[in-house]
C-alpha cells in the first residue's frame, strides 16, 4: 500500500486544518442511509453482546505513543483486548460480502486503525444486513505489521500536510494581498 494523495485525502487535511484554526467542526447532514446504518449498528451490537461478548460503547479514543496524537471513534470495545466495527449492508451487498468471506477493502484501514489507536490485538468486523432479517457475518481481524507501519507513516504525513496548510493560510493572511473581514460565528437555526 501507499499513502493516499487524492481529492478525498486533501479534503480531509483541509478539514483538520480548518478545525484547528477556527475551533469549529462542520456539521454534516444525516441521510436516510446513514441513519439506517446507525440504527442497524446499535441493534447488531445488542445481538453481538447477547450472543458473543458484551460490547462497551466508548467515545473518542486517542493514542500518542507514535510521536503524534491519533484518534478514532470505535463502534465498541470488547473485554480488555478486543473491539468491534459494524457495517450495515444492503442485502445483495451483504450476500456478496458473505460469499467473499473477507473484510471489504473499503473498511480494512478503518479496522486496522482502530486496533492501532486502541492498542488492542484483535477486532471483530461485523457485517450486518440492513434492517436485520439475515445473517450477521463476524470476521476476527488481527494486526498486520505492514499495515500498522503504513498507518503510522500516513498519520505522520497527514500531520505534516495539516501543518503545511495551516502555515500557508497564516502566511496568506499575513501577506496583506487579500481583503479579509472577520466574520462573527452564526449558530445554525434548528427547525422542528
Whereabouts are the PLM-identified features?
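Accessory terminal regions of nucleic-acid processing enzymes
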Residues: 1-192
Amino acid at each position: 500500500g501507499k499513502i493516499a494523495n487524492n481529492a478525498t485525502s486533501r479534503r480531509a487535511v483541509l478539514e483538520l486544518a480548518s478545525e484547528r484554526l477556527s475551533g469549529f467542526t462542520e456539521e454534516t447532514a444525516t441521510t436516510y442511509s446513514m441513519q439506517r446504518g446507525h440504527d442497524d449498528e446499535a441493534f447488531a451490537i445488542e445481538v453481538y453482546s447477547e450472543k458473543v461478548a458484551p460490547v462497551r460503547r466508548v467515545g473518542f479514543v486517542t493514542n500518542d505513543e507514535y510521536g503524534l496524537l491519533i484518534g478514532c471513534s470505535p463502534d465498541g470495545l470488547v473485554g480488555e483486548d478486543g473491539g468491534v466495527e459494524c457495517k450495515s449492508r444492503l442485502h445483495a451487498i451483504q450476500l456478496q460480502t458473505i460469499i467473499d468471506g473477507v473484510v471489504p477493502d473499503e473498511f480494512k484501514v478503518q479496522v486496522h486503525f482502530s486496533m492501532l489507536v486502541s492498542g488492542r490485538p484483535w477486532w471483530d468486523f461485523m457485517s450486518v444486513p440492513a434492517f436485520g432479517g439475515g445473517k450477521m457475518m463476524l470476521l476476527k481481524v488481527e494486526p498486520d505489521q505492514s499495515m500498522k507501519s503504513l498507518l503510522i507513516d500516513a498519520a505522520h504525513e497527514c500531520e505534516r500536510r495539516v501543518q503545511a496548510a495551516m502555515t500557508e493560510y497564516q502566511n496568506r493572511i499575513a501577506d496583506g494581498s487579500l481583503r479579509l473581514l472577520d466574520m462573527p460565528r452564526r449558530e445554525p437555526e434548528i427547525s422542528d
